[in-house]
Amino acid sequence: PAYEILSGLVGSEMCIRDSIYNVLPGTTSAASVKAKFLKRLILKDDSVVEIDQKLAFDLLSHMKGGPSVEVLLDLAFHEDTKIAEQAANVLKTQVFLYEADTNRLEEKYNAGNKIAEDILESYSEAEFFTKLNAIPEKIKVVTYVAAEGDISTDLLSPGNQAHSRSDRELHGQCFISKKAQDEISQLKIAHPDKSVMLVAEKGTMGVGSSRMSGVNNVALWTGKKASPYIPYVNVAPIVAGTNGISPIFLTTVGVTGGIGIDLKNWVKKKDSDGNIILNNDGEPILEQLYTVETGTELTINTKTKKLYNKEETKELVDVSSSFTRQKVEFMKAGGSYSIVFGKKLQNFAANILNKDPAPVFASPREIHSEDQGLTAVEKIFNKNAVGLTSDKKLVAGSDVRVKVNIVGSQDTTGLMTSQELEAMAATVISPSLDGAYQSGCHTASVWDIKAQDNIPRLMQFMHDFGLITARDPKGIYHSMTDVIHKVLNDLTIDDWAIIIGGDSHTRMSKGIAFGADSGTVALALATGEATMPIPESVKVTFKGDLHSHVDFRDVVHSTQAQMLKQFGENVFQGRVIEVHIGTLMSDQAFTFTDWTAEMKAKASVCISNDDILIESLKISKKRIQTMIEKGMDNKNQTLKGLVDKASLRIEEIKSGERPALKPDRNAKYFAEVVVDLNEINEPMIADPDVSNVDISKRYTHDTIRPISYYRAEKTVDLGFVGSCMVHKGDMKIVAQMLRNLEKKSGEVKFKAPLVVAAPTYNIIDELKEEGDWEILEKYAGFQFDDKNPKQAARTEYENILYLERPGCNLCM
């Protein structure tokens, strides 16, 4: 019936556009119908006046993979040699081939088929890449300052509009503001020969998360169309910041073949002796080197790797880091995925033809140091490295393709991840992964009509793909809305593991975890691998004793304050924080590692001793077993496999065969921060400093103050204990405080609203076993109901205790 409908489109240009052009590529059901229909047109089994054979092949060439590649292979091996040759020429441009496709090529080649041989020869030479146009030598840009200070990804793609992220046209309407959208549109009209460069003046671009939807929105408003036949998918955005681009956001920019520029247009003013000059508030005085105010015309030279003024008479800043050979490859190919899949395809073809692949792509940068020990992250990367050319150990700065152990997909970005998987033509999870999890935490707080429509579809897709899902597509087991990072922390059963998660707070107390955009998550799910440079590390150790009246949260804040005091700038940005937490259990260590996302660190890794690691692994085993008992395991018995691997790791540690991860004594660090616990003598407050006269210093995460600074003059508007930044111990403290108040006064009265949201159901179960949940329930004026969850966000609060559903209530 679909073919009959499509065949009736003769003479209707609008119908042709909407039914043929505007179809999402990859493995979508519409793409399957489209590919088969185009095959019928090529074979003249059907006809549409507006689509001749040449256009039909052109349309197939833009469909990326899956059913389109299947059709192209059918046509390449067709008896009509003219059709076969045309299909082969299109196939030579495609990179999203999977095992079923490559198996067909190999079989035909082994049977002596010349077309198959011709295609494989082309792949071995990487003609799908070499025949693409080079990036322009000169890129003319006009600036648009989106804001002064750090720009959160929430400005580019608001969290409260997460339901529409997979609908690029609709979600694009929430980009910054209507005023900004109009101003950008006017700049494009006034400068048709230039690209609009989005700027964070006096700040860092893209802090807070990787936010693929944020990059999509920037590309939608300022980038270029990826294909004339694919709606609302743009590539090549250009973003910039005085202090550069946040590391995880920069990775996402690379996914779309974009450019991220560190402007360095403001510097700290120095005196004649080279000392930084401070103002009356003790803050460095900034000096402007050149302007990037909205409407400024600049030129990027991709050959000299410099940023120039409009006339190209003055060099403004070196941008070599923006145009490494690998990044230029991403730009040329329209994104990093094409390079990842292209390399695999080239290696496959070369192997079949028994030849070396053509040296087309940038060789991975391999940095060795014979007399240097390894940091913890360097050890993890070396253990998990794939395809190394030598046995020499790699150090920071080396480009490495690594095996990924655990992958997490988040529910507000999951629909985008599923779209990316469809676009890559992926249909099943990589068997090399230890496990993968689809969360339901960000839609736990408000189960509105949008979530009710979107999330069941997402859970079904991910379940079919091979993930453990928070919600049961069959509706049998109890929905688990636990915070994604907490679940991944439990699922991580090896301190040498690499974890990729679809959320900026993907930080673990075991192994090393990287927050990633939905596309990188999709790539990890499909291939079981990730590619990135080994990051530099900053070592954090502690001295002194922690006073009994302060909390570990105060240690977290003080680490930030003492680091800034020691170095004058954020040495954590873009690096791994290697924290030596010693005897902290995994839940407490998680509190520290989760915070590192706020300091713009790329990741964090915890160094603990053997006994503590064993206890942490036992906690993981218990919690995974609980998931199994709830009926959450899949047909592959992923969860059972994790329990078995945890048991094996415990035995390795006990026997001394493979002790807990530790860096070498002579490891090289970018910096070493020593936190003096004796200095922490009162609670520490992280202040967004919203009234700072310097706008760029607001919302920076850099203002840490002792509670005495506020002289007890502040009123508390609302208290919140929960979500990913707390652990069970924090919940027990709240319970004990209620007991203490009850004992003292006979009752507990609330003078402000208090919201308590356990991160996971496991923690609630444990609090019930340990007698702490009872007191929380006793004084709760509201308690979540799984059978009747909230369907709208709460905007007004009474002075009562709210016991909210486990999940990401704070953010959402």
Can you name each region flagged by the protein language model?
Residues 1-16:
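Short, small-residue-biased leader/transition segments that mark boundaries at the very start
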Residues 13, 17, 49-53, 84:
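Residue-level detector of extended alpha-helical repeat arrays and alpha-solenoid scaffolds
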Residues 39-48:
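Acidic, Ser/Thr- and Gly/Pro-rich intrinsically disordered linkers and low-complexity segments
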Residues 22-34, 41, 58-77, 81-812:
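Fe-S-dependent hydro-lyases/dehydratases of central metabolism
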